[in-house]
UniProtKB/Swiss-Prot annotation:
Catalyzes the conversion of inosine 5'-phosphate (IMP) to xanthosine 5'-phosphate (XMP), the first committed and rate-limiting step in the de novo synthesis of guanine nucleotides, and therefore plays an important role in the regulation of cell growth. Could also have a single-stranded nucleic acid-binding activity and could play a role in RNA and/or DNA metabolism. It comes from Tritrichomonas foetus (Trichomonas foetus). PROSITE patterns: CBS, IMP_DH_GMP_RED. This is Inosine-5'-monophosphate dehydrogenase. It is found in: Cytoplasm. PANTHER family: INOSINE-5'-MONOPHOSPHATE DEHYDROGENASE (PTHR11911:SF111), INOSINE-5-MONOPHOSPHATE DEHYDROGENASE RELATED (PTHR11911). Contains 2 potassium ions bound at each subunit interface. The second potassium binding site is not conserved and not observed in crystal structures of IMPDHs from other organisms. K(+) 2 binds at residues 20, 22, 264, 266, 460. GO terms for biological process: GMP biosynthetic process; GTP biosynthetic process. Changing residue 319 to S: Has less than 0.06% of the wild-type activity. The gene is IMPDH.
């Protein structure tokens, strides 16, 4: 006989936080939003900790390399979408890992007998303005000079000018030995007023380039999420079909964490995928799993060895899984149920497995609710799709600037691997839509504004950390009338005057 749940499931919109005591030190500047990304034993620390509890969704229209770089600068992490070829996904991961490494392996290189046209082509392809000239045109050839925009011919139509005739030769370059520390390299850049400092070995082979822009950027971005080599952290999505080929390529490219991307993660296919990764890499490769919406699903993936588990089916703004298949659960109820099972699992095993709330976030305060209910971090699609750094184009519709946003279950994404249970047969219907979202500008400004709200609400609850919020939060269900009462009502808001229609 089928199991029935008597209580209806709820969304974040049906809850509010009740204020707690705010002490004198409860001010937003004192709030610490760091949170674990992967599982750890009681008494130990997670091997990867986010500095902010936000990650971008594994979607074509959200998480490309620009998004990954921008979010890592702010302390979060992106999961590069897997609905593309293995080679292109690995290339995106590689680009993020090498964007700011302190010591950067040059990806813009020419030989001295090449031309200005070649320099322009490389700069356009890589978006880098410093081109290394090596004897063989490789990243680690003998360094002969550099070409920057200051070396360009006055007449830019002289595209046949030889590189050897326009470059700044090695004899005029300031360089440093490969034993030089990053702090020492930055000091040289600062004192010599350089934009780029080539790092060479004893035989004049180019090893790396240290850029001034990376130093300047690090002074502004104090919250950057980087590895031990000062490279940005980046995640990548995988599926349960080609994981035997995709995972090694992503690991080789430098992915810091993987996540199985599926609309329904309560599946033996995910267990098989995790098992294969554990057999080949042990615990060195971190992999999340999901999505699930109840404690039973959590327990299955926890026992399978998942490093974190995602919660949510059908709650995304572009997801139509619920109306197509009748599968899913209200996001708030799902988080509450899964967190209860996670806490029980922790008591039984001493292993803390972070959970991610994926979907259902409409307003910024929903982020705070998800965290208060026990989520360790939040995966967002629509939220990040609005930003300049998302990989979609901007369009103007009825005078408003919009960005395209489509679901991985839409025909446009054609990523059927996410929306089946494995095997060879693929589904023939959509579980996502193709849409637009209002353009919101740069990621940095928007994330800062959203997290300021989260911090302020945490202070209202008397909490300075996410664990404190989860232990102190007082959460109440609200009626539909209370929801109306919570917004502006019985007035005509000035910026909405053109939309006013008397009853």
């Amino acid at each position: 006989m089928a199991k029935y749940y008597n209580e209806p499931c709820h969304t974040f919109n049906e809850y509010l936080l009740i204020p707690g005591l705010s002490t004198v030190d409860c001010i937003p500047s004192n709030v610490n939003l760091s949170t674990p990304l992967v599982k750890f034993q009681k008494g130990q620390q997670s091997e990867i900790n986010l500095k902010i509890p936000l990650v971008s969704a594994i979607m074509q229209s959200v998480s490309g390399e620009k998004m990954a770089i921008a979010l890592a600068r702010e302390g979060g992490i992106s999961f590069i979408f897997g609905s593309q070829s293995i080679e292109s996904q690995a290339a995106m991961v590689h680009a993020v890992k090498n964007f700011k490494a302190g010591f950067v392996v040059s990806d813009s290189n020419v030989k001295p007998d090449q031309t200005f046209a070649d320099v322009l082509a490389i700069s356009q392809r890589t978006t880098h303005n410093t081109v290394a000239v090596t004897d063989d045109g490789t990243p680690h050839g003998v360094l002969l000079g550099l070409v920057t925009q200051r070396d360009y011919p006055i007449d830019l139509t002289q595209t046949e000018t030889k590189v050897s005739d326009m470059m700044t030769p090695f004899s005029k370059l300031v360089t440093a030995h490969q034993d030089t520390k990053l702090s020492e390299a930055n000091k040289i850049i600062w004192e010599k007023k350089l934009n780029a400092l080539p790092i060479i070995d004893d035989d004049q082979h180019l090893r790396y380039i240290v850029f001034r822009k990376d130093y300047d950027r690090s002074q502004v971005c104090h919250n950057e999420l980087v590895d031990s080599q000062k490279r940005y952290l980046v995640g990548a999505g995988i599926n349960t079909r080609d994981f035997r080929e995709r995972v090694p390529a992503l690991v080789e490219a430098g992915a810091d964490v993987l996540c199985i991307d599926s609309s329904d993660g309560f599946s033996e296919w995910q267990k098989i995928t995790i098992g294969w990764i554990r057999e080949k890499y042990g615990d060195k490769v971190k992999v999340g799993a999901g999505n699930i919406v109840d404690g039973e699903g959590f327990r299955y993936l926890a026992d399978a060895g998942a490093d974190f588990i995602k919660i949510g089916i059908g709650g995304g703004s572009i997801c139509i899984t619920r109306e197509q298949k009748g599968i899913g659960r209200g996001q708030a109820t799902a988080v509450i149920d899964v967190v209860a099972e996670r806490n029980k699992y922790f008591e039984e095993t001493g292993i803390y497995i972070p959970v991610c709330s994926d979907g259902g976030i409409v307003y910024d305060y929903h982020m705070t609710l998800a965290l208060a209910m026990g989520a360790d971090f939040i995966m967002l699609g629509r939220y990040f799709a609005r930003f300049e750094e998302s990989p979609t184009r901007k369009v103007t519709i009825n005078g408003s600037v919009m960005k395209e946003y489509w679901g991985e279950g839409s025909s446009r994404a054609r990523n059927w691997q996410r929306y089946d249970l494995g095997g060879k047969q693929k589904l023939s219907f959509e579980e996502g839509v193709d849409s637009y979202v209002p353009y919101a500008g740069k990621l940095k400004d928007n994330v800062e504004a959203s997290l300021n709200k989260v911090k302020s609400t945490m202070c209202n609850c008397g909490a300075l950390t996410i664990p404190q919020l989860q232990s102190k939060a007082k959460i109440t269900l609200v009626s539909s009338v209370s929801i109306v009462e919570g917004g502006a009502h019985d007035v005509i808001v000035k910026d909405r005057i053109n939309d006013y229609h008397p009853k």
